[in-house]
Amino acid sequence: MAEERPGAWFGFGFCGFGQELGSGRGHQVHSPSPLRAGVDVCRVSASWSYTAFVTRGGRVELSGSASGAAGGCRDAWASEGLLLVLRAGPGPEALLQAWAPDSALRGEPLWAHSVVPEAVEEDDPGGEAQIGRLPLLPCARAYVSPRPPFYRPLAPELRARQLELGAEHALLLDAAGQVFSWGGGRHGQLGHGTLEAELEPRLLEALQGLTMAEVAAGGWHSVCVSETGDIYIWGWNESGQLALPTRNLAEDGETVAREATGLNEDGSQVKRTGRVEDGAPAPFIAVQPFPALLDLPLGSDAVKVSCGSRHTAVVTRTGELYTWGWGKYGQLGHEDTTSLDWPRRVEYFVDKQLQVKAVTCGPWNTYVYAVEKGKS
């Protein structure tokens, strides 16, 4: 059996601050473009104005409004308020450093904190690139917020496995595959059926009994993928980021007939369509406060998910990439700036015979890791 060739990272979308996105010409890239240093990169974290790349050799490199590089790094997490860098410390400890982006990796950090990691998880089979765990700390007992108070403890009984931060809310996936949400809820992004805020992590009851494998937080929407490959999505649908019919795109002629299944408060299913048969106006969805079950074309199973501010990207079990939502800067990768309220496959990777393994979205851009098909 031949060894699998190393993969590469690709980028597309907004690059108005000079952050590396493939060719990086102008302020936007409309189609996936290889990163110049993509072969050596193993993790990517993108904020609005800059991106942090972590290499396999443990080096973090910044591109965009923030610049600089440093070695001895395990992970990095970029936000407009803070750059977090996890560095190897003495013995089993790791050192978490926080920097202001405009002075990142120069002089002394704003603050530093020693953490003792839990057992390191093995990479997926094949050794493909993994997305970092920050802002969840390696001890899984706390996380870091880009706004004060920066260090926020988590109840030990939560047994956090993954934590994602939106603009105003947080999602947590625990070791049992349950989802918790808290923070602002004015766009339904918490999934509890109301627009009320939650001060503490609250179990997402609509998904009880379903084991989730991944969660992702957009600016004001949320997505999770189950172990069986199902997608559940909720929150704000202003730009079609939920793949549900939205008035904004219908007025632009972008909405097409399709169907999605939602969950009522009692767990019963309700179906909504983009157009009804008699031509009557569609029941547009502005806010979806409960998880909706979303089917990809051809019944494809999802394995990875990431969200931008108002767009969503999903990787299927067969290595295809689907994107939808806000596309003004080409962040959907469809060679245009069209916004979509339905999942569309990114044909670039199909045409190039590439299998997508990972995706991570910045607010207005998207980064993808892919390998050549048939080389393993």
Swiss-Prot record:
Keywords: Chromatin regulator, Chromosome, Hydroxylation, Repeat. GO terms for biological process: chromatin organization. The modification (3R)-3-hydroxyarginine is found at R141. It comes from the Eukaryota. Its main location: nucleus. GO terms for cellular component: chromosome. RCC1 repeats lie at residues 6-56, 176-227, 229-317, 318-371. Residues 1-169 are annotated as: Interaction with KDM8. The keyword Repeat applies. The keyword Repeat applies. Coiled coil: none annotated. It holds the Pfam family RCC1. InterPro entries: RCC1/BLIP-II, RCC1_domain-containing, Reg_chr_condens. It is found in: Chromosome. Found in a complex with KDM8. Interacts (via N-terminus) with KDM8 (via N-terminus). Plays a role in transcriptional repression of satellite repeats, possibly by regulating H3K36 methylation levels in centromeric regions together with KDM8. Possibly together with KDM8, is involved in proper mitotic spindle organization and chromosome segregation. Plays a role in regulating alpha-tubulin deacetylation and cytoskeletal microtubule stability, thereby promoting cell migration and TGF-beta-induced epithelial to mesenchymal transition (EMT), potentially through the inhibition of KDM8. This is RCC1 domain-containing protein 1. The gene is RCCD1.
